[in-house]
Structure formats: C-alpha cells, structure tokens
Amino acid sequence: LYAFSTENWYRPVYEVKALMNLFKYYLNKKLIQLHAENVKVSTIGDIEPFPKIIKKYIQNLTNLTTHNDGMYLNLALNYGGRAEIVRATKRIGLQLLQKKISIEEVNEKSFALNLDTGTDPYPDLIIRTAGERRLSNFLLWQSAYSELFFSDKTLSLIHISEPTRLTS
C-alpha cells in the first residue's frame, strides 16, 4: 500500500501535517485489528524522517504482527522506487568495499535482495486508482511483470471483485 511517497514531503506544510495526523490515527487504531485478523505488516521506504510518535506506532505494528501468517500488508512509507534503487546500489557498493561480496556476485538476484522488499514476492497485480495511468515511482524494479489495473474510482469505491475479474 503506497501510503506516503518521497515526493509527498514537497506538498504544502498543512497537507503533510494532515497526513501525519492520519498516520497517527490509523496506525494506532488499526494495530489491534490487524493483529487480530492475523495480518503481517511490514514497511518499505525510509521512516527516519517521520515524527518519533509515528515511528513508534510503525515499530509497534510491525513487531506485534511479525509472526502472523495471514495476509501480508506492506506499507510504503516515505518510499520512492528511484530512491529504493539508489539505497540498494549503496548497500551493494558498501558490501563490495567491505569485501563481503565480489564484483562477480553482483547480478539481478543479488541486486533484488538489496532492495527494500528483499525476499518479499513481487506484486502480481498493481491497482492504480482515481484515474491515474502511471506507476508514480512505485516498485519500479519489482513491477516489471506485474499486471496493472487502472480504475477511475477511488480506492474506497472499488469493489474487491473488480481486480479479480481482470486477472481471472
């Protein structure tokens, strides 16, 4: 779930503040519900710039649900596909400098393992709502073979069967 992009920091201050308040509300409110429904929650992106209270809620949510084995919810927070690729490149560069890997070991598989998503499966389906017809810097590496579903509706108005009909 693409919850907050790296580009969102460039919105007007009042919008960013409103988004932070929404995060505080939903991260805290949904914590027990997601755990009770056996949902495992993880995050991708760089959460360091977020306020301390939001980082605490994120940590609580991921820690509480870490052993859940039901649905998997990955929250993209302060995430951008290009920034993720840069982070992966830096991780590999550091491993090369520290002689943990050799240049011969750098390939698509080792690169993918250094992305924020690591060993997570790539998405089979990406749903884009509200009339947008672009990926908007989301999972650029991982979406290479994903099905794309575009809807003019907002996410809250999409019936769960719509993407299922598309892919079946």
Could you say what each language-model-derived stretch is?
Residues 2-4, 78, 128:
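Short beta-strand segments
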Residues 2-20, 24, 30-55, 60-64:
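Short, charge-patterned binding micro-sites
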Residues 5-9, 47-50, 80-83, 132, ...:
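Conserved nucleotide-binding/hydrolysis micro-motifs of P-loop NTPases
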Residues 35, 46-114:
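Elongated, mostly alpha-helical coiled-coil "stalk/stator" tethers of large membrane protein machines
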Residues 37-39, 69-71, 144-146:
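Short glycine-/polar-rich loops that comprise or flank the Walker A/P-loop
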Residues 74-77, 150-154:
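Phosphate-binding beta-loop-alpha motif at adenosine-nucleotide cofactor sites
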Residues 86, 93-97, 103-151:
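Active-site oxyanion/phosphate-handling segment shared across diverse enzymes
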Residues 158-168:
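Single conserved hydrophobic/aromatic residue that forms the stacking wall/gate
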